[in-house]
């Protein structure tokens, strides 16, 4: 089959972790001669532009996000709202459906990549466009929670059922704690935008796709992908690790100067992504745990619920006690550049798939502190299956961590003489070497492009 350049439209969920993940794949596809139309709102475009390494092949197409009652003015992505308001962002995204149809009719792409817009496959089919579900979450999570064997158990699934993986799941060691299973069970009854149940939205998006794609490699997630393929009776492909090319900008001076004042590998960096807003007690235990380590730390976290700024949420006397070695910042940061900084030796991560992919190719050690959803199962895979990080201990019933448990996990990974640390470091080094193998990545992207050609040609 003779290959030809494809025209691919992209419309990811309006969260920066999803947006950047899609764009990083675009960069890999553009190198191979494919044309990309990346549909995104203006605020997201401004943040994404430095990461567009092929502007002649990747074009941003502006979509205006309509206002929905309850959202702040000009809210365009989840970064503009607190976690409880994310369903309204989803509703706003659903309201762009007619505009998306108009855009796709004019653009005439061969394929459209999507994730949360469950209406996209039907729309694409009507326009003669192939629909690719590109999942930024791990196949570990999808296999555990969203496959037909689990989905058809319905909304009355018990917590005890969810504490164990579904029948046929490839890894019996990956399980949920009581508080996590309770949250997952409740989530099955939650709507997420436009009065659509969250799990209905995700299941339809997966079940009606022409192709299911995951940002991973089979060496890490192969058994989970095979399980999903059998469950949905659909082709499931890996795009490869999609290693991030360095952004075209330098690290902001305030961060590079601050980090430059410490020894190599000595700084603890903590970031929970653009979507996570901690409860006040979680925020307090986190920052007090960082203080307790006695190590220099940079924490990029949003102000907790009920607070306007991170400064106003600090415990009394905290800033004075950590002056010179502690930096708590409430805004968006250039995480990829921070993780690559030689002073950073540890990364406390919420285990979002994007953050993990950035972390695994760097040398910093991983402390796993998941918050919601797929992050929890990502943490189990990283901590229990791959053993490349140490998860912060939480109460089984309440899911609460303490300053001591935060400090303990950091202290373990930062102590190169600790037996757990030695094992984690060795496993991380092995995975890092695998992911940084350019031949591996290139072969995956080439194979993925060939699969896209076959889907378009109907093979």
UniProtKB/Swiss-Prot annotation:
Enzyme class: transferase
The keyword Translocase is assigned to this record: no
Annotated GO MF terms: flavonol-3-O-glucoside glucosyltransferase activity; UDP-glucosyltransferase activity
Entry comment describing in which tissues the protein is expressed: Expressed in leaves.
Catalytic reaction annotation: a flavonol 3-O-beta-D-glucoside + UDP-alpha-D-glucose = a flavonol 3-O-beta-D-glucosyl-(1->2)-beta-D-glucoside + UDP + H(+)
Entry EC no(s): 2.4.1.239
InterPro entries referenced in this protein's UniProt entry, alphabetically: UDP-glycosyltransf_plant (IPR050481), UDP_glucos_trans (IPR002213), UDP_glycos_trans_CS (IPR035595)
Ligand binding (UDP-alpha-D-glucose): 136, 333, 335, 350, 355, 358, 374-375
Catalytic residues of the enzyme: 18, 115
Keyword Transit peptide: no
Keywords from the UniProt entry: Glycosyltransferase, Transferase
Domain of life: Eukaryota
Residues reported to bind an anthocyanidin: 18, 373
Function: Flavonol 3-O-glucoside/galactoside (1->2) glucosyltransferase converting kaempferol 3-O-glucoside to kaempferol 3-O-sophoroside. Has a broad in vitro activity for kaempferol/ quercetin 3-O-glucoside/galactoside derivatives, but cannot glucosylate kaempferol 3-O-rhamnosyl-(1->4)-[rhamnosyl-(1->6)- glucoside] and 3-O-rhamnosyl-(1->4)-[glucosyl-(1->6)-glucoside]. Has a higher preference for UDP-glucose than UDP-galactose, and no activity with UDP-arabinose and UDP-glucuronic acid. Represents probably a recessive allele of the gene.
Assigned protein family: Belongs to the UDP-glycosyltransferase family.
Extra remark beyond the main annotation: Flavonol glycosides (FGs) having glucose at the 2''-position of glucose or galactose that is bound to the 3-position of kaempferol are present in cv. Nezumisaya and absent in cv. Harosoy, whereas FGs having glucose at the 6''-position of glucose or galactose that is bound to the 3-position of kaempferol are present in cv. Harosoy and absent in cv. Nezumisaya.
Name the record gives this protein: UDP-glycosyltransferase 79B30
